[in-house]
Amino acid sequence: MRLVLSSLIVIAGLLSSQATAATAPEQTASADIRDSGFVYCVSGQVNTFNPQKASSGLIVDTLAAQLYDRLLDVDPYTYRLVPELAESWEVLDNGATYRFHLRRDVSFQKTAWFTPTRKLNADDVVFTFQRIFDRRHPWHNINGSSFPYFDSLQFADNVKSVRKLDNNTVEFRLTQPDASFLWHLATHYASVMSAEYAAQLSRKDRQELLDRQPVGTGPFQLSEYRAGQFIRLQRHDGFWRGKPLMPQVVVDLGSGGTGRLSKLLTGECDVLAWPAASQLTILRDDPRLRLTLRPGMNIAYLAFNTDKPPLNNPAVRHALALSINNQRLMQSIYYGTAETAASILPRASWAYDNDAKITEYNPQKSREQLKALGIENLTLHLWVPTSSQAWNPSPLKTAELIQADMAQVGVKVVIVPVEGRFQEARLMDMNHDLTLSGWATDSNDPDSFFRPLLSCAAINSQTNFAHWCNPEFDSVLRKALSSQQLASRIEAYEEAQNILEKELPILPLASSLRLQAYRYDIKGLVLSPFGNASFAGVSREKHEEVKKP
């Protein structure tokens, strides 16, 4: 699943001899971009250009919406399912069969490595999903057999078949009804690939390039990539929704923290994704900048490795949770841009349990409970991502605050910074004690939180960092999926939240607003509560430059 990328390499050198290398890497982000596009500054790593092969990261948070489309989308304002590649669909057999009718004039991108000869059809959808769920499919094991999001849902066990009824109709048959199925197909993990491109790679015996040299139907296509520096996206002129307004977008990967803010202030960046909450005053006071805030479908949490004593004891997990001053996290990390979490679900979720209780901060009680449990001289290793995330703008600072809190109750915490591109592989060796992580979903269905993060299947799919497996909990989740009645599902998810409150495999910390800052002349930028939004409608308004007072 992980790609090994050198530090100075364009997509041509990495994946193909056909693309053109940039000769001046120091100037690529801004040399010609103001006249023909914009610079989007974000912190993150690129492990793959196929969101199906990732559990999170830049491909899921930013790139998938530019490169690919899905059968369905979620409206960022109404939170309802809307058509995308499927112009209509039918739910049959009480939710065990789903039939999709595809749009007839959708073009794949023409790139340096592939020229399509036909439009999107049912073969592409069948190929995309058979590769994921059919373990005997010739493409299933290419670049590893892991499809983290779908593996956590046990997708391969639940999908009986996906078949082409005609050139523009596809039917999924499930082993049992699943009320969340459509919502999972609306995530960016369900991006549709080109079967024709896959066939070309098979003839060349270069199947591994499917996930590295992307070909999709989205508004932009990959033009150039320099690891740790930038990604250049070129407009897909044949995009089915109409030509994107700007010819190119540069995704700047080169700076973190205050470096990205400096680039925004000097005009080297046009858009700053996930600015630190501590920077809000600067952003609000500068007339050259605009700031957008929206509630987000995300959760930041602390995961306890329940495979390792003494963290395998729920009483120890509860005692440690009492030591954490969550109110201080709200003030020092989020600066009023988040609310303390009482559940794995954000409060915006329709299944949120209003009776859920925030874990109290009581260090004295924590010390007493740890002593009663015989816990002394405990040392825990806390693994932390190094870059800002949609759910946590300052993970390392958060870890330092947790470290100080636990020290007050006699627990030594050793912070282990982990770079994003290596985090999943290192976490799966199960040597960590605690993990500071989070989850953002582009689905409004609560199943998008529960199963990927805490189901038994999610352990092997590398998304269950607590390594917690509870058959009763899994049974409740299956009960929720078996009903098309909202009231029944809400009741089941309340039961699931009660189990989590009792067992505490993860400690919910915060549900944050989504933040995005941008230059005054950038128009049409959408900030979705689900994260990944298309850049197709973004433009630059030309007028006299605003000066800082």
From Swiss-Prot:
Keywords linked to the UniProt accession = Peptide transport, Periplasm, Protein transport, Signal, Transport
Q: What induces it?
A: Part of the sapA-sapB-sapC-sapD-sapF operon, RNA detected in mid-log phase cells.
Pfam families registered for this protein in UniProt: SBP_bac_5
Q: Which CDD domains match?
A: PBP2_DppA_like (cd08493)
- PROSITE patterns documented for this protein: SBP_BACTERIAL_5 (PS01040)
Phenotype caused by lack of the gene: More senstitive to protamine than wild-type cells, but not as sensitive as sapC, sapD or sapF deletions.
Q: Which InterPro entries match?
A: Peptide/Ni-bd (IPR030678), SBP_5 (IPR039424), SBP_5_CS (IPR023765), SBP_5_dom (IPR000914)
GO cellular component terms, semicolon-separated: ATP-binding cassette (ABC) transporter complex; outer membrane-bounded periplasmic space
GO molecular function terms listed in the Swiss-Prot or TrEMBL record:
peptide transmembrane transporter activity
Q: From the UniProt annotation, give the residues forming the signal peptide.
A: 1-21
Q: Record keywords: Transport included?
A: yes
Its BP terms in the Gene Ontology are: peptide transport; protein transport
Compartments in which it is found: Periplasm
What domain of life? Bacteria
Among its keywords, does the record have Protein transport? yes
Q: Which family does the record assign?
A: Belongs to the bacterial solute-binding protein 5 family.
Described function = Involved in a peptide intake transport system that plays a role in the resistance to antimicrobial peptides.
Q: What is this protein called?
A: Peptide transport periplasmic protein SapA
Q: Which organism is it from?
A: Salmonella typhimurium (strain LT2 / SGSC1412 / ATCC 700720)
